[in-house]
UniProtKB/Swiss-Prot annotation:
Amino acids binding ATP: K3, T160, D161, T202, G203, G204, M205, R206, T207, K208
Similarity remark: Belongs to the glutamate 5-kinase family.
Reactions it catalyzes: L-glutamate + ATP = L-glutamyl 5-phosphate + ADP
One Pfam family this sequence matches: AA_kinase
Transcription found in the keyword field: no
Protein name: Glutamate 5-kinase
Binding positions for substrate per the UniProt entry: S43, D128, N140
Residue ranges of domain PUA in the record: 267-349
Gene that this polypeptide is encoded by: proB
Lineage: Bacteria, Pseudomonadati, Pseudomonadota, Gammaproteobacteria, Lysobacterales
Pathway(s) it belongs to: Amino-acid biosynthesis; L-proline biosynthesis; L-glutamate 5-semialdehyde from L-glutamate: step 1/2
């Protein structure tokens, strides 16, 4: 899995630069020639769109203008990658809902698997044209980590515009030293990451470490490297790492539990009492309506939600995530009741559990 940010593809004068993409394409070609399968997660559609309509962000609403630029630039982005390869390049656009909904998540996995079987090179991007801003995945680092787990990748390579992870921000601290090997993403390591990186993209070093943590939970190592350095990219093509290696977690969680833990969450939560909290975290129990104190948001049956312990603020600690068997409206009506009362209260029942333990992961 290779993730390429827009800052590595954007030309100084606007649009996309084939010169910067060439080295990364050579890295891809070397891996393909070695018989490896590879998936690319590539940003750059909005940057490409700005070259077509440079004043779009000045005259339109920020969200609508960005979505329009993404629509204009996505074709340019795919064309950029296609020019480097003889094999077909497949465009795959994903949204928050595609990863949150279990059926669509599995369908995306099947599609990507078939593309790889057919010898195509999938190039994935978030579908900015239709993504609702408050439900956006946020950055392609996060998307790359989830897709890496989706396709059961062996490694996640994240191309950056610096040489990897440093002990401090090298742009502002001359004493910053590069870290070649990170056995574990401790709080101290996470604190080394600064804020945003280039002003072209949306992801800084912090998001890259968060992506590495998500990939690591699926047993996938992450490599951060300087995608602008031809020397570094050529070394990588020869399997000689020049950058930062971040080890996978010692214990790999099961595929379904990974999805429950890391898939995007609907804007909603189920509030539970102390007894239910103890049952979930200590006994691995399902969540029954008797332990439910209420619901936040307007989620539907089958949505992924957070499960929070109720406190005096009404918005307590998030203890778990899971797929709700009932809508927020239904949960408010059956909260605190016995499971046998569900059908009498609602007029129907989807079972005794609000969230079944097989559809739940404790954080």
């Amino acid at each position: 899995m290779l993730k390429v940010g827009s800052s590595l593809l954007a030309a100084d004068g606007g649009g996309l630069s084939p010169r910067f993409a060439l080295g990364l394409a050579q890295f891809v070609s070397a891996n393909l020639a070695a018989g490896r399968e590879l998936v690319i997660v590539s940003s750059g559609a909005v940057a490409a769109g700005r070259a077509i309509l440079p004043k779009a962000m000045d005259v339109g609403a920020p969200i609508a203008a960005r979505q329009a630029l993404a629509a204009l630039g996505q074709a340019q982005l795919i064309a950029l990658w296609q020019r480097f390869f003889e094999r077909p390049v497949a465009q795959v656009l994903l949204t928050h809902d595609d990863l949150r909904n279990r059926r669509r998540y599995l369908n995306a996995r099947a599609t990507l698997g078939e593309l790889l079987r057919l010898g195509a090179l999938p190039v994935i991007n978030e579908n900015d044209t239709v993504s609702v801003d408050e439900l956006k995945l946020g950055d392609n680092d996060n998307l790359a980590a989830i897709v890496a787990a989706l396709v059961d990748a062996d490694a996640l390579f994240i191309a950056t515009d610096i040489d990897g992870l440093y002990s401090a921000d090298p742009r502002s601290n001359p004493l910053a030293r590069p870290l070649d090997d990170v056995p574990e993403l401790t709080p101290e390591v996470l604190a080394m990451a600064g804020g945003s990186g280039s002003n072209v993209g949306t992801g800084g070093m912090r998001t890259k470490l968060e992506a590495a943590a998500k990939a690591g939970a699926a047993g996938i190592e992450t490599y951060l490297f300087n995608g602008r350095s031809g020397e570094v990219v050529r070394a990588l093509a020869l399997d000689r790492l020049r950058g930062t290696r971040i080890h996978a977690a010692r214990t790999r969680i099961a595929a379904r539990k990974y999805w429950l833990r890391h898939a995007p969450v609907e804007a909603g939560a189920i509030l539970i009492d102390d007894g239910a909290a103890a049952a979930l975290t200590g006994k691995g129990a399902s969540l029954l309506p008797g332990g439910v104190a209420g619901a936040q948001g307007d989620f539907r049956r089958g949505d992924m939600v957070e499960i929070r312990r109720r406190d005096t603020t009404g918005d307590g600690q998030c203890l778990a995530r899971g797929v709700s068997q009932y809508s927020a409206l239904d949960i408010r009506r059956i909260a605190g009741r016995h499971s046998r009362e569900i059908e009498n209260v609602l007029g129907y029942s989807y079972g005794e559990n609000v969230v079944h333990r097989d559809d739940l992961v404790v954080l």
